[in-house]
């Protein structure tokens, strides 16, 4: 399997981005006037294809590959977040830890906004289904608050 990670990010102030803030009451109240960074990372469609091939021959290998994929995409996101954190701290600001849509009280629908705002489908091949699943499956969207 030859797959390199892909990432996209965008720094914005949600108060200036009325269409983004208007999509979610939670976003309007939590991030009003706050600068944020949208993040998206993936290990690519090749991983999904490799995992499908494994599932035909061995359920155990398919299960192990699931964990490998999760660990790999988390590493991609950790590295992207660290890169942004260094830049933000160089400006004398602080980056709060990333939060992904669907965890806690962050609405799952925010993934759709992040994908759109980052143009992630065109830029890195990440899209979202009608039921809000990311494709390729080992992809992550997130938001970090800058303070």
Could you say what each language-model-derived stretch is?
Residues 1-62:
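Active-site helix-to-loop segments that bind/position phosphate- or nucleotide-bearing substrates
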Residues 7, 34-37, 56, 73-76, ...:
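Extended aliphatic helical segments
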Residues 15, 51, 65, 85, ...:
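Generic detector of well-ordered alpha-helical segments enriched in charged/polar residues
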Residues 55-109:
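Long, amphipathic alpha-helical coupling/dimerization segments that relay conformational signals between
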Residues 91-147:
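Short terminal or interdomain "cap/linker" segment that borders an active site or interface and mediates
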